[in-house]
């Protein structure tokens, strides 16, 4: 009985932190192969190494971070293991890339968003399907999901073969303001993480989704380094603030402007 009570208390403590047990594994645990059909990997024609992630939002469009822009991008869809391909994996290249700023620049707290139109639409399959854009902004206190092929250790760079997933908490923007003193008073970014540390998005997770209630609410942008430090949440581009711009571009209004 004592053992059962101890185990129960540990479980409650674990759930209260909204994180999975891991010895400072930044990305959490291996994602279920069927839970991320919208997650895409980016590499270049010269290198097969994944350097960023992105999100399929319909059969012809991918959403990622502006900092993930490169020449000769290759977009891999339906991928789980880098070394054991899925039968339905597909590769695409960009037809067009859209940014909030014509100079393709961004700041650490603003406009870190890139919309990619694929040269050919993808075919939905077991491991390929889009994720919905947000219908409303996320609420403070929400438990949201992050995922990607980013490093899974804090002391050195260790890239996994498969994407890792973890749950983190949505905080008020003021929490990040107190940590990162140069943040402006207002920003189109979201503040999310685990205050106890140990769970975080990190290098190569950039551009990937922050998922709340089954919708993409954020794009991995930046945070403290080393990653997963206590009391240092990360910043995510607030997708809801850019929804009108995204939908206008997809509808054919390529001169649409981002919110100021």
From Swiss-Prot:
What family is this protein classified in?
Belongs to the peptidase S1 family. Snake venom subfamily.
Q: Which residues form the Peptidase S1 domain?
A: 25-251
Q: Name one GO molecular function term.
A: toxin activity
Q: Where in the cell is it found?
A: Secreted
Electron transport recorded as keyword: no
Q: What more is known?
A: Negative results: does not hydrolyze fibrinogen, prothrombin, FIX, FX and protein C. It does not induce platelet aggregation or agglutination. It does not bind to platelet phospholipids. It does not bind to factor FXI and FXIa, FXII and FXIIa, kallikrein and thrombin.
- Which stretch is the leader sequence? 1-18
Role summary:
This is the first member of the serine protease family that has strong anticoagulant activity and lacks enzymatic activity. It inhibits activities of three blood coagulation complexes: (1) prothrombinase complex (composed of blood coagulation factors Va and Xa (F5 and F10)) (IC(50)=164.1 nM), (2) intrinsic tenase complex (composed of factors VIIIa and IXa (F8 and F9)), and (3) extrinsic tenase complex (composed of tissue factor and factor VIIa (F7)).
Can you name this protein? Vaa serine proteinase homolog 1
Q: Which UniProt keywords apply?
A: Blood coagulation cascade inhibiting toxin, Disulfide bond, Glycoprotein, Hemostasis impairing toxin, Pharmaceutical, Secreted, Serine protease homolog, Signal, Toxin
The post-translation modification note in this UniProt entry reads: N-glycosylated. The toxin exists in multiple glycoforms.
Q: Which GO terms describe its biological process?
A: proteolysis
């Amino acid at each position: 009985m004592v053992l059962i009570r101890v185990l129960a208390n540990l479980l409650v403590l674990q759930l209260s932190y909204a994180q999975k047990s891991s010895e400072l594994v930044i990305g959490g645990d291996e994602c279920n192969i069927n839970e991320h059909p919208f997650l895409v990997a980016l590499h270049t024609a010269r290198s097969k190494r994944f350097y960023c992630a992105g999100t399929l939002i319909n059969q012809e469009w991918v959403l990622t971070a502006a900092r993930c822009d490169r020449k000769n991008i290759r977009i891999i869809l339906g991928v789980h293991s880098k070394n054991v391909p899925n039968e339905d994996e597909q590769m695409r290249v960009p037809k067009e890339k859209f940014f909030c700023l014509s100079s393709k620049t961004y700041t650490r707290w603003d406009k870190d968003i890139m919309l990619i139109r694929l040269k050919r639409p993808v075919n939905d399959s077991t491991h390929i399907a889009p994720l919905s854009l947000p219908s409303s902004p996320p609420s403070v206190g929400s438990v949201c999901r992050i995922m990607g092929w980013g490093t899974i250790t804090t002391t050195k760079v260790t890239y996994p073969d498969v994407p890792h997933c973890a749950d983190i908490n949505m905080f008020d923007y003021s929490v990040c303001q107190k940590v990162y003193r140069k943040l402006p008073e207002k920003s189109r970014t979201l503040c999310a993480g685990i205050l106890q540390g140990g769970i975080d998005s990190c290098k190569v997770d950039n551009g990937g989704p922050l998922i709340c209630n089954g919708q993409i609410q954020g794009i991995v942008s930046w945070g403290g380094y080393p990653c997963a430090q206590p009391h240092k949440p990360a910043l995510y581009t607030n997708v809801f603030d850019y929804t009108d711009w995204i939908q206008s571009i997809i509808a054919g209004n390529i001169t649409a402007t981002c919110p100021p």
